[in-house]
A protein has these predicted regions:
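Transmembrane alpha-helix boundary signature
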Residues: 81-97
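Short, membrane-exposed interhelical loops at transmembrane-helix boundaries
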Residues: 157-186
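Structural signature of hydrophobic alpha-helical transmembrane segments
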Residues: 34-50, 70, 94-105
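Cytoplasmic-side transmembrane-helix entry/capping segments in multi-pass membrane proteins
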Residues: 62-75, 96-102, 126-129, 215-216
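Hydrophobic core segments of alpha-helical transmembrane domains in multi-pass membrane transport
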Residues: 24-28, 44-45, 49, 76-83, ...
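Hydrophobic alpha-helical membrane-insertion segments
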Residues: 130-155
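C-terminal ends of transmembrane helices
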Residues: 51-64, 111-121
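Intrinsically disordered, low-complexity non-transmembrane regions of multi-pass membrane transporters
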Residues: 1-8, 162, 166-171, 206-227
Length: 227
């Protein structure tokens, strides 16, 4: 695969959160605010890049019988590094993400990319795939986090100081009073419903594009649509 195809598949065509539905547990549980979504998304992106690189370097040299176990250990090392870094530099965000940060180790997205793609590709392609898949997952988290924060708290980016530092306290937008927000949007059931609506909208857009492309192909071939 060329670089453009890898990027397109990771971010759009095979978006891990909105198309493959991988990593639903953190996607639904942590995306209550833009800050939480951005923090976990960046952490997952970093783990994907590092674990894919390690899998590409070690995979061809590992016996098939122990490959999965070694990949889990490599992923655990990457997650531990990210978690300790976040605990040192962003303690507020680290506390807000809680158990879901170390649970990146069990995220099926990370292990699936290491086993099914990175271990069979060059290090450069593996790193690019990790970046593309991580970016796709980050965008899915941000989209859901923005909708949930807006509907549930009436704000956007209200807690970005957890990630960017005290200088950004109050840097978000409070669009309407928090008391007027929808409580269900802050909870996991609301996240599940909103994700379903986002998936339905995405499917409708893709279906419309297929119909338009199909009609264009028929017209180009000289066949009247509907004949």
């Amino acid at each position: 695969m060329n670089a453009r195809a890898i990027l397109r598949d990771g971010i759009l065509g095979h978006n891990p959160g909105l198309v493959q539905l991988l990593g639903l547990c953190p996607l639904l549980a942590v995306s209550s605010t833009v800050a939480n979504a951005l923090g976990l998304g960046l952490a997952t992106l970093g783990v994907l890049v590092v674990s894919n690189l390690l899998a590409a370097l070690a995979g061809p040299r590992l016996p098939r019988e122990v490959r999965l176990a070694v990949f889990v250990l490599l992923i655990a090392a990457a997650v531990t590094t990210v978690e300790l870094t976040m605990a040192a530099w962003w303690p507020g965000l680290h506390a807000s993400l809680g158990i879901f940060l170390p649970l990146i180790i069990t995220n099926c997205l990370v292990l699936a990319r290491a086993e099914s793609f990175a271990s069979r590709q060059s290090p450069a392609s593996a790193v690019l795939d990790g970046f593309a898949m991580g970016t796709g997952f980050l965008l899915a988290l941000l989209a859901l986090g923005a909708v949930r924060e807006l509907l549930g708290r009436g704000s956007l980016g209200a807690d970005l100081d957890l990630l960017l530092g005290p200088a950004f306290a109050g840097a978000g937008w409070q669009l309407f009073p928090e008391a007027s927000g929808l409580l269900i949007a802050r909870l996991a059931p609301g996240a599940f419903v909103l994700l379903g609506l986002m998936l339905a909208a995405g499917n409708a857009i893709r279906a419309r594009r297929r119909r338009v492309h199909g009609t264009s192909a028929l017209v180009a071939s000289g066949v009247e649509p509907g004949s």
